[in-house]
Amino acid sequence: PEFLEDPSVLTKEKLKSELVANNVTLPAGEQRKEVYVELYLQHLTALKR
């Protein structure tokens, strides 16, 4: 899969689905998009390096 350096271009729903697809546990409740962007960077973008 192609992990983005700048995940903020994705929609919040897309971010959430990408995280779930990669077995990342999402925080409870509805979060701001930045929260998911941060998780994406920590878990997915980091894997690519």
Curated annotation (Swiss-Prot):
Keywords: Hormone. The keyword RNA-binding does not apply. InterPro entries: LEM-like_dom, LEM/LEM-like_dom_sf, LEM_domain. Residues 4-47 form the LEM-like domain. GO terms for molecular function: DNA binding; hormone activity. Residues 32-36 are annotated as: Essential for biological activity. It comes from the Eukaryota. SMART domains: Thymopoietin. Pfam families: Thymopoietin. Belongs to the thymopoietin family. Hormone of the spleen with pleiotropic actions on prothymocytes, mature T-cells, the nicotinic acetylcholine receptor, and pituitary corticotrophs. This is Splenin. The lineage of its organism: Eukaryota, Metazoa, Chordata, Craniata, Vertebrata.
